[in-house]
Amino acid sequence: MKNKYIEQFEQKQIEGKNVPEFRAGDTLRLAIRIKEGDKTRIQNFEGICIARRGNGVDETFIVRKIGANNVGVERIFPIYSESLESITVLRRGRVRRARLFYLRDRRGKAARIKELKK
């Protein structure tokens, strides 16, 4: 059980953020605030969410994309991170697993995920 002061602090951290509902298998576009020296810029990172873990302030998710030269790039983001400017859900994926780590071994068409019918 957490201390009530810690719970209040964590609740304040969560209140200001507007996070869309997404799951593993969804294709996301993240706008990440990057600080280089005294300048800041926004960089987009688009990929498939392959896992979510934790809850509350400690919740994180992993996004995987295929970069240049067919190299897989995975990044782990805290959901309530200050560096995340926005999270946009581009596609809803139809998957039967909560963790899609098997996509690491797949290449090309085998790594595709079916789109969820509405």
From Swiss-Prot:
InterPro entries: Ribosomal_bL19 (IPR001857), Ribosomal_bL19_CS (IPR018257), Ribosomal_bL19_sf (IPR038657), Translation_prot_SH3-like_sf (IPR008991)
Gene3D superfamilies for this protein: 2.30.30.790
Presence of the UniProt keyword Transit peptide in the record: no
GO biological process, one term: translation
Signal peptide start and end residues: none
SS bonds (residue pairs): none
SUPFAM superfamilies referenced in this protein's UniProt entry, alphabetically: Translation proteins SH3-like domain
Keywords recorded for this protein, A-Z: Ribonucleoprotein, Ribosomal protein
Gene Ontology terms: cellular component: cytosolic large ribosomal subunit
Function of the protein: This protein is located at the 30S-50S ribosomal subunit interface and may play a role in the structure and function of the aminoacyl-tRNA binding site.
Family membership: Belongs to the bacterial ribosomal protein bL19 family.
The protein's name: Large ribosomal subunit protein bL19
